[in-house]
Curated annotation (Swiss-Prot):
Function according to Swiss-Prot or TrEMBL: Clostridial collagenases are among the most efficient degraders of eukaryotic collagen known; saprophytes use collagen as a carbon source while pathogens additionally digest collagen to aid in host colonization. Has both tripeptidylcarboxypeptidase on Gly-X-Y and endopeptidase activities; the endopeptidase cuts within the triple helix region of collagen while tripeptidylcarboxypeptidase successively digests the exposed ends, thus clostridial collagenases can digest large sections of collagen.
Region (S1 metalloprotease domain): 87-761
Record protein name field: Collagenase ColA
Other facts noted in the record for this chain: Clostridial collagenases enable the bacteria to infiltrate and colonize host tissue, and contribute to gas gangrene (myonecrosis) pathogenesis.
GO biological process: proteolysis
Binding-site list for Ca(2+) 3: 866, 868, 894, 897
Length: 1104
């Protein structure tokens, strides 16, 4: 079973339990859903000239933001995710120094410094614990903030930004460290409200000077990390109005735009986080409901600014649209916000970014409907957007290589990328020694390359295709598709071709070297391939046609001249995502091995191809501890830097795109034989949109074998010479020929033997070409399906009269696609979808058929909440029924929830986890008796929904839901299958409770030594039992919660029904206590709270 993840760069996350090495990010709120990106363009990442693009995952701006800020090597924040540096002095302060200061001096000092003056500010250690565990000290900072709030001026911010950062550091440390958990309480955070209001009621609270803008920004950050009330939120309207009224002047001012953005972001995060801690997750149950309309009016007004929209302010309008959609639920009449989004769709041009953003927000927050209840048909909007922004399609290699591009991406550029792929592939195959796909039938049988016109248009890919755009390009392995964009030198230090070469290498890695999909298997559990995948991708991007693989100047210049500032060999081999450095140093290591130790390169590559994880780890460990090898690696980098002026960036030559005269294919074959002495040469012709190409494969017999590594070097050199000799011939088409060799053997004479493959331009006009008849697509499937249920689509009855079907492309109408002949799909939302099947024949002919599919709702049979503690298998909550929805929450302290269910008979079991906050959550499933090896994990991931299914044998299974990135999040989990609610052995001789026993005067009488099976529900919240005690006794009461509902028990004396005499001690699902009782009548009240659904329990009474 393959895992639907993507191979990537900046943000690959390991699906491991929380206690594994935690991944951190160097950029602020970098990704959506748990998607991973690759080959992020270093210059593009910082090319916005201070502008902040829309943050896709706005739910992560609080503790996550702080975590990201301290993720860099020097423990200092990066980018716009932290307050601007004050830089008033360069002195570094330790917590030991700060802890020795009195409160007054401390606060005054904080006002004069930057967060950068305290490098350990966000680190938990003895000093920070001592500092923040002192409640009076924290209170002094809050009072200091309030005082500064009253006294700051237009020219002096009185240290407000740094005071805020100190408080944010405390909240961060309190969230992730239980020793400081008091800082994470609403009570303490609410103590900031007077300070916030002091800031707002200061007459200087507005946009204006740099100091004023900084104060507004700091307030937004504080709101997001601390607290707010309707008054604080509504007090922000003047800032939003001022920005709107002066948008011509303020739109291009970074500090003002950033200040407004942080206000919107902080308010959105805090108010939505309150919902997740509110009964029923309902905005109506919060203090903000129907009380922040003034703020909403100003926010909504920023959604439509008419002809004042320009490149400087568009990003802020995009954010206003996004936050309007998310916060409309706080209005008594949400349709007001809904209409604001509708107005945006009417005001902005069809398929402009703002139009699509507004439509997306209606789809996400209002069920895809306008205020009149009509469907906006967002799927059609996305389809039209793809048609507008990607109107061109180019096919190569009989349809196995497809490019979809913007209208400004030139045909010449497309052709160059195709030929660049051949140069990279040829050198890649030489090194890895494999040209057969590890698994046939994967989506990457057809590679699709999507190229937008520009970075701006590329941002739409997040909406219309659902993938992160905070990168220079992204390869999604489970759909065999690579997304990127054309760029100018001002926008990127890399050309499109350079980036394409890097990404194309990831495609080759996934198809020919690394077994399974990205993220699947043991290789990915600890991130041991991180350096290999990214370092060799940078390396192979330097592939040439005839001169092997060259070190690229654009990457070499990123190496440090001072060895003390470089990554060591150990550091490279154990690199994790979070910084850019290991790309450069992994590139240098790959170049070192290629030029000085191919045996080492081959050995680690073979471990990967053979899926030998332990062998690979052992080999990496031995390399890491080899100090002599590290010295050679460092020496090699010295040589690269000393020669940097002579380096360049390999790109394809103009010969590929120049015209080529016609030449008989037989002449080409004979010429290749002549210069190479290749035997048994066979050829295969493939058609592309602009030209025809050939692959010729034959056998080369070399000299006496000197061992595989030496044979490889000899063959590599000889093949380069063969290509150069061929290029000397008069026909210029030979300058398009690339070649590789694989399958080393030694013949009976002791000579080495390789299979050699040539690829080049075929201009033979006599090559058989006929008029192709279009194939016919045929769809076989059901016409309706339940939401989240699997539906099967069969395209195998599609036909082609004069050939065969070579490719299938399903478009399921919800943005998802498949390239399989027989596909399965699940819809996440109800509605009617138009499914399209496009088939391509062996001659490039295309035909499309469509069919309507109706998706209907499937409501869970019951909704319950998890019962803590359930962090261990022995304390697991039971999931008693199929299609029961369980609500749970994870955090730094509560990082794992365990559940169990019993499978009654062999059959398919489906598990669906909805990640409500888009944080780092996943799940694994274990069989009772082997809790160390999982039997199933989340194989489907669209960013918020983690799915998996498998045919399971009867028995008990344990489900582990856990967080892997130190973020708090709420989730729901649903299990469907043949489940049974197994009554435990201890309950088989129990009596059944008899209703109605909901009041003391209707209590069910039971013996003081008895077992009772009872049931609670939302309509039956309590059961009462009467017990007569004849003698002084120790009554042991154990109530076992069978179905994980929220329940408890209290014991009352008949003499006082207002005050209980004893209560339960909770231990997982067991509620127990031993009560010392005098003779008399007692009432045991077993009750449910929070309306957590229907559940069974067992009462066990033992009178000692």
């Amino acid at each position: 079973m393959k895992k639907n993840l993507k191979r990537g760069e900046l943000t690959k996350l390991k699906l491991v339990e929380r206690w594994s090495a935690t991944f951190t990010l160097a950029a602020f709120i970098l990704f959506n859903s748990s998607f991973k990106v690759l080959a992020a363009d270093k210059k593009v990442e910082n090319s916005n000239n201070g502008q902040i693009t829309r943050e896709i995952n706005a739910d992560q701006i609080s503790k996550t933001e702080l975590n990201n800020e301290v993720a860099t090597d020097n423990n200092r924040p990066l980018g716009p995710s932290i307050a601007p540096s004050r830089a008033r002095n360069n002195k570094i302060y330790t917590f030991d120094e700060l802890n020795r200061m009195n409160y007054s001096d401390l606060v005054e000092l904080i006002k004069t410094i930057s967060y950068e003056n305290v490098p350990d500010l966000f680190n938990f250690n003895d000093g920070s614990y001592t500092f923040f565990s002192n409640r009076d000290r924290v209170q002094a900072i809050i009072y200091g903030l309030e005082d500064s709030g009253r006294t700051y001026t237009a020219d002096d911010d009185k240290g407000i930004p740094t005071l805020v950062e100190f408080l944010r550091a405390g909240y961060y440390l309190g969230f992730y460290n239980k020793q400081l958990s008091y800082l994470n309480t609403p009570q303490l955070k609410n103590e900031c409200l007077p300070a916030m209001k002091a800031i707002q009621y200061n007459s200087n609270f507005r946009l204006g000077t740099k100091a004023q803008d900084g104060v507004v920004e700091a307030l937004g950050r504080l709101i997001g990390n601390a607290s707010a009330d309707p008054e604080v939120i509504n007090n922000c309207i003047y800032v939003l109005s001022d920005f709107k009224d002066n948008i011509d002047k303020y739109g291009s001012n970074y500090s003002k735009g950033n200040a407004v953005f942080n206000l919107m972001k902080g308010i959105d995060y805090y108010t939505n986080s309150v919902i997740y801690n509110t009964k029923g997750y309902d905005a109506k149950n919060t203090e903000f409901y129907n009380r922040i309309d003034p703020y909403m009016e100003r926010l909504e007004s920023l959604c439509t600014i008419g002809d004042k929209l320009n490149n400087d302010n568009a990003w802020l309008v995009n954010n206003a649209l996004y936050y309007t959609g998310r916060m409309g639920k706080f209005r008594e009449d949400p349709s007001i916000s809904q209409r604001a989004l509708e107005r945006a769709m009417k005001e902005y041009p069809y398929l402009s970014y703002q139009y699509i953003e507004a439509a997306n927000d209606l789809d996400l927050n209002f069920g895809g409907k306008n205020s009149s209840g009509n469907d906006i048909d967002f799927n059609k909007i996305k389809a039209d957007a793809r048609e507008k922004y990607l109107p061109k399609t180019y096919t190569f290699d009989d349809g196995k290589f497809v490019v979809k591009a913007g209208d400004k991406v030139t045909e010449e550029k497309i052709k160059r990328l195709y030929w660049a792929s051949k140069e990279v592939k040829a050198q890649f195959m030489r090194v890895v020694q494999n040209d057969k796909a590890l698994e046939e039938g994967n989506p990457d049988d057809i590679l699709t390359v999507v190229i937008y016109n520009s970075p701006e248009e590329y941002k739409l890919n997040r909406i219309i295709n659902g993938f992160s755009t905070d990168n220079g390009g992204i390869y999604i392995e489970n759909i065999g598709t690579f997304f990127t964009y054309e760029r100018t030198p001002e926008e990127s230090i890399y050309t499109l071709e350079e980036l394409f070469r890097h990404e194309f290498t990831h495609y080759l890695q996934g198809r020919y070297v690394v077994p399974g999909m990205w993220g699947q298997g043991e290789f990915y559990q600890e991130g041991v391939l991180t350096w290999y995948e990214e370092g060799t991708a940078e390396f192979f991007a330097g592939s040439t046609r005839t001169d092997g693989i060259k070190p690229r100047k654009s990457v070499t210049q990123g190496l440090a001249y001072d060895r003390n500032n470089r990554m060591s060999l150990y550091g490279v081999l154990h690199a994790k995502y979070g910084s850019w450095d290991f790309y450069n140093y992994g590139f240098a290591l790959s170049n070192y091995m290629y030029n000085n130790n191919m045996g080492m390169f081959n050995k680690m590559t073979n471990y990967i191809k053979n899926n030998d994880v332990s062998g690979y780890k052992d080999y990496i460990a031995s390399m890491s501890s080899d100090y002599g090898l590290n010295d050679k690696y460092q020496d090699y980098m010295d040589s690269l830097l000393n020669n940097i002026d002579n380096l360049d960036v390999p790109l394809v030559s103009d010969e590929y795109v120049n015209g080529h005269e016609a030449k008989d294919i037989n002449e080409i074959t004979n010429d290749i034989k002549e210069v190479s002495n290749i035997k048994d040469l066979s050829s295969n012709v493939e058609k592309s949109q602009f030209f025809t190409t050939y692959d010729m494969r034959g056998t080369y017999v070399g000299g006496r074998s000197q061992g595989e590594e030496n044979d490889w070097k000899d063959m590599n050199s000889k093949l380069n010479d063969i290509l150069k000799e061929l290029s000397k011939k008069s026909w210029n088409g030979y300058k398009t020929v690339t070649a590789y060799f694989v399958n080393h053997k030694v013949d009976g004479n002791g000579n080495y033997v390789y299979d050699v493959v040539f690829h080049g331009m075929n201009t033979d006009t006599n090559t058989d070409v006929h008029v192709n008849k279009e194939p016919k697509a045929v769809i076989k499937s059901d016409s309706s399906v339940i939401v989240e249920e699997e539906i099967n689509f069969d395209g195998t009855e599609s036909k082609d009269e004069d050939g065969e079907i070579k490719a299938y492309e399903w478009d399921f109408g919800d943005g998802e696609k498949s390239n399989e002949a027989k596909a399965t799909h699940k819809y996440n939302k109800t509605g009617e979808y138009e499914v399209k099947l496009t088939v391509t024949d062996n001659n490039g002919g295309i035909n499309t058929e469509s069919k309507k599919i109706k998706v209907v709702e499937d409501k869970p049979v019951e909704v319950i909440n998890e019962s803590e503690p359930n962090n261990d298998f022995e304390k697991a909550n039971q999931i008693a029924k199929s299609n029961m929805l369980v609500k749970g929450t994870l955090s730094e302290e509560d990082y794992s929830d365990k559940y169990y269910f019993d499978v009654a008979k062999k059959g398919n079991v489906k598990i669906t986890l909805n990640n409500l906050n888009s944080v780092g959550i996943t799940w694994t499933l274990y069989k009772e008796g082997d809790l160390n090896n999982y039997v199933l994990y989340a194989t489907g991931n669209d960013g918020t929904v983690l799915k998996g299914e498998k045919t399971l044998e009867p028995g008990r299974y344990y489900l582990s839901v856990y967080t892997y990135d130190n973020q708090s999040g709420t989730y729901t989990v649903n299990v469907k299958g043949n489940l049974k609610n197994e009554v435990k052995e201890t309950a088989k001789d129990a009596i059944k409770e008899v209703e109605n026993n909901n009041d003391f005067d209707k209590a069910m009488k039971v013996d003081s030594n008895s077992k009772i099976v009872g049931t609670l529900s939302n309509d039956d919240l309590k059961d009462i039992y009467s017990i007569d005690i004849q003698n002084p006794s120790d009554l042991n009461i154990v109530v076992e919660n069978l179905d994980n509902i929220k329940m408890n028990w209290l014991l009352y004396s008949a003499d006082d029904l207002s005050n209980y005499v004893d209560y339960a001690n909770a231990d997982g699902n067991k509620l127990s206590n031993t009560c010392k009782l005098n003779p008399g009548k007692y009432y045991l009240c077993v009750y449910q709270f929070e309306n957590s659904g229907t559940g069974n329990y067992i009462v066990n009474l033992q009178n000692k």
